[in-house]
Amino acid sequence: MEITEKAKKFAIMAHFGQVRKSEKDKPMIIHPIDVAYILKKYGFDDNVVAAGYLHDVIEDTKYTKNDIYNNFGEDILSLVMGDTEKDKSLSWEERKEITIEEVKKLDLRHKAIVCADKISNLEDLIICFVKFGKKDFSCFKRGYEKQKWYYESIYESLIYNEDENIPMFVFLKDLIDEAFTLEENNFVKDEIFKGKQREYKKLKNLHFRKVELMKLKRLFDLPTYVIEFTGTPRTGKTTLIN
């Protein structure tokens, strides 16, 4: 079995029953599938793509570093750990400050996973803005200013000692500007779409609706899996049966 397919199956099993923190109507597995897709799109090797599927497993499920190492080896474990917060007992600010400094030290393969993770999250955030018609950060424990600081700082850490013109870094920067600029760039709206404000808004909405649909399509493109569950919800065990 290819390493990426094995990682995908493991992620499906590990995140079974979980939903997105920001959107309770969506299964958690949408996000790692999206991250892996982004990494593949930008041409990264199979181990990096596999780590994209697995990047939230240690942080958000019962599975441990040993589980990743025993199933996927040292390289993929290292890639996953590059996008895993080490000490959840620290405050949000402390954890993010540590992450910002640690990302600077990573090589490009490790940075790519962090970048793809942030791209996926920001696309989801912008989709929510489009749905509700406004930029609302109230769903976050830390609001606009802290989120803006974190994403902009992570971007600076990603391009540290790297070429800022690497396509995925450029795309991340565009998404950060889109998400955290409260005043719209009026050139496109007022000059290109002069007198056609409704058409501009519709086109923008359609674009991000398409992004959302493509994320969902990647989920529905998965082959059928059978998941066997034994035990109680707290102590139960899930087994993936192809």
Question: At which residue positions do the language-model features occur?
Answer:
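Hydrophobic anchor at the beta1->P-loop junction of P-loop NTPases
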Residues: 229
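Walker A/P-loop
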Residues: 238
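Phosphate-binding P-loop
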Residues: 217-224
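Active-site helical microenvironments for divalent-metal-assisted chemistry
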Residues: 1-194
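N-terminal pre-Walker A segment at the start of P-loop NTPase domains
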Residues: 192-217
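Walker A (P-loop) phosphate-binding loop of P-loop NTPases
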Residues: 234
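Generic low-complexity, intrinsically disordered sequence content enriched
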Residues: 176, 186, 207-210, 220
